[in-house]
Structures are given as structure tokens and as C-alpha cells.
Amino acid sequence: MAQQKVAVVLGLQWGDEGKGKLVDVLAEDADVVARFAGGNNAGHTVVVDNISYDFHLLPSGIGHAKCDCVIGNGVVIHLPGLYEEVEKNMAKGPHLQGWQSRLKISDRAHLVLDLHQKVDGMKEEERGLDKIGTTKKGIGPTYSSKAIRHGLRVCDLMGDFGIFKQKFLQVVEHYQKLFPSLEVDVDAQLKAFEGYAEKVRPMVTDTTLLVHRYLKENKRVLLEGANATMLDLDFGTYPYVTSSSCCVGGICTGLGLPPQAVGDVYGVVKAYTTRVGDGAFPTEDFAEVGNYLQTKGHEYGVTTGRKRRCGWLDMMVVNYACMINGVTKICLTKLDVLDELETIKIAVAYKKGGEALLGMPASQQVLNEVEVEYVDMPGWQTNISEIRDFEALPTQAQAYVRKVEELSGVPVKWIGVGPAREAMIIVPPRQ
């Protein structure tokens, strides 16, 4: 019998595409949902029974009572943030009950220290006008600590606390040399970590072994990507990116799975484009359309609360992300946000000096200077948020979806028409 493969949900733009909602829908049929990269800089909103839950570090499947959730070795964990997230969501509704017995944390995952968050903010201030737009959650400094091999891992916290203390002091010393004004209450921090050690101990395990065991047992494993392709450290709009691998390759390094274990790759695409923070954004609209999308789409960051920049759907971005990730099906979200527009533009090419560019420019300067070629699609100017059948959509909305399929070469399987779990249309295969 062929071994079960994992399915993965990835963002194909600059994040905030609606990955959490698709994961939540798919988690109903999954046995396991796992995170493999990023930290609590991610923000996924899931609406269950009209209750809106915000997840940052917890996998979005945590709201399903029969679903195990895994935080893999590629994730960086801020333990105070984890427990704060649990408390906030538990106060909203009952869907996280029993979460401790279902959450598995990698012993190889790195710890985000409070000082990492302070350093993140200090580094951002140092940049002056060249700010990256970081969430200041300490993600970059934690991955930096990991790369220069003085990071603290969960297994360190599970071991001899005296050794953990020594390593912690070394990290403090390193950063205080770089940032003399950095203040760290060492005693308070160590006391807090002693408490967290006992809290998380029952959840900590070798998640690489665990995920392979799940697959051997033919469990249905769903992987939840954080951030998105255009925020990937290698393939995104560097340096305005995150510090981890948000693409399909991050699965192998962030969970310990071989490439042949990856089955379907579901790419999530917003029906228009948004990004938080600075960096190139060729289809950004600074006028009426951008303001409309921001207001109608409630485009504010889940993690930061910052206004998202808005613009037209960019198929150069989508096609680039589909190519890198081997996307097998697309989930097109927030189609209902376009309801009131008379004409809808889709970017189909970048040009420089009149010449069409074949790929995605690596240079931010080039990307900032490209001329964007659009196709115009007729709007439908009617409310589609209550529609649940593809054939019941206005013909113009159907045409928009089919155009995305045509331009990407990838079938659209789902359409999101609202924030609720039920506000999803299954798209029939193209005849």
C-alpha cells in the first residue's frame, strides 16, 4: 500500500490571503494539522459558529476536537505569546477545549526570547527610513540566533536548567554587546522559563518521528503554511521579507519530511492583492480602488493591526508562486469584496523599457519601476456573499474565476465569499 502523503496550504501572495480559513475547512477531514515555519508573526483568522478566533502560533486545526496539532522544528516559539493566545481564544468560545492534549511541540524548535523582541524593535528603529515593516515579534533575531548557533531550543528547556541558564546568559551577553542599552531582567526571565518548562513538558516530543508515524498509520496530515511566497527569505521581495522558508521547501526543513511525502499543494490567492509593511507592490492602488478594497475587505493586519496596502490581482506574482511551489489547486478568497466594482483589472505582465519581463525581478529597484500590463474584466455589481453554488454566481464572477485558471494553468477548487467557514463555494472542474 502506498504511504499517505501530506497536503499543504500555502499563501501565494504577501500573506493575509485566507489560509487559516481553508485550513479550518480542510481540518474537518484531517487527523493532524502541522505548522512548519514562522512564529507568532503569522495571523490566521478562523470563524466558527459566528465566533472569530485569531491564531498566530497555534495551528488553525486546534479548534477541531479530534485533530492533533503539531508545531514543527522550523517554527520559532515565544512561550508567553503561546499562552496569551490560548487565553484570548478560550475567552471567546468553547472550541479550544482540551487543546493541551492535542498540541505537540518539537523539541528541536527554537525559542523566541523577550530580548529577541526588544532587539527586533531596536533594529527596526536603527533602519530609519529603510524600515522592513517587521511585526517586532522577535522572529528575525531568533532565526539569526539559530543561524549563528547560539539559539536556545525547546530541548534545552527540557534538560538541565543549570545548563539552560548558562546558555541564556550567553545570549544576553551577545546582544548586550551589540545593543548596550538593552535591558534584560535575567532573574525574572529565568523564573518564567522554569514555569513554562513544566507547563509545556507534556506536549514536547520528537515531532519528526511523530509526523512520519502519522503517515505510516495512514493518518490524514494537513500542513499549514505561514506568511507567504512573496515573504519567503529566498524567493520573496528581499529584504522586505520574513526570516523563514514559507514555500514548499520549508516543509522538508521545518518538519523533517522528504519531498516525496508532499501530495497536493493548495495555493491560497486573494481575489485582489494586499501587503503589510514596506516593499515593492507593482499593482498597488493609491486612489479610490485601493481605499475601497481596504474598507470593504477590512484590510487590517491580524498580528499588527496595521492597514494593509491594496491593489489589483497580480498574476505575475501568482504564477511565480505556483511555479515555485508546484501548486495543484487554488483557493480564491474574498471574491465578494469585488462585488461593487464596475471594472476589475488583472495584472498579466511586467514590462521594462517596453520589453516584457519573463520572470519575477530579484531587484526591488526593478520591481518598483516595472510597467504593469492589465486585462479588464467586467464586474458583477451584485452581492454574492450568500451564494454557495458556482453556477449560481453571476456570469461575470464565473468568468473572473475561469480567467484566473486560464492565466495560472491551475484549477480553482474553492472560492471564498465571506469570513465564515460556510462561506465557501466548491468549483466544478472546467469542462
Swiss-Prot record:
It is found in: Cytoplasm. Its EC number is 6.3.4.4. It catalyses: IMP + L-aspartate + GTP = N(6)-(1,2-dicarboxyethyl)-AMP + GDP + phosphate + 2 H(+). Mg(2+) binds at residues 16, 43. Gene3D superfamilies: Adenylosuccinate Synthetase, subunit A, domain 1, Adenylosuccinate Synthetase, subunit A, domain 2, Adenylosuccinate Synthetase, subunit A, domain 3. It comes from the Eukaryota. CDD domains: AdSS. The keyword Nucleotide-binding applies. Keywords: Cytoplasm, GTP-binding, Ligase, Magnesium, Metal-binding, Nucleotide-binding, Purine biosynthesis. Its main location: cytoplasm. SUPFAM superfamilies: P-loop containing nucleoside triphosphate hydrolases. GO terms for biological process: 'de novo' AMP biosynthetic process; IMP metabolic process. One of its GO terms (molecular function) is magnesium ion binding. The active site is at residues 16, 44. Binds 1 Mg(2+) ion per subunit. Its cofactor is Mg(2+). GO terms for cellular component: cytoplasm. Pathway: Purine metabolism; AMP biosynthesis via de novo pathway; AMP from IMP: step 1/2. Plays an important role in the de novo pathway and in the salvage pathway of purine nucleotide biosynthesis. Catalyzes the first committed step in the biosynthesis of AMP from IMP. NCBIfam families: PRK01117.1, purA. This is Adenylosuccinate synthetase.
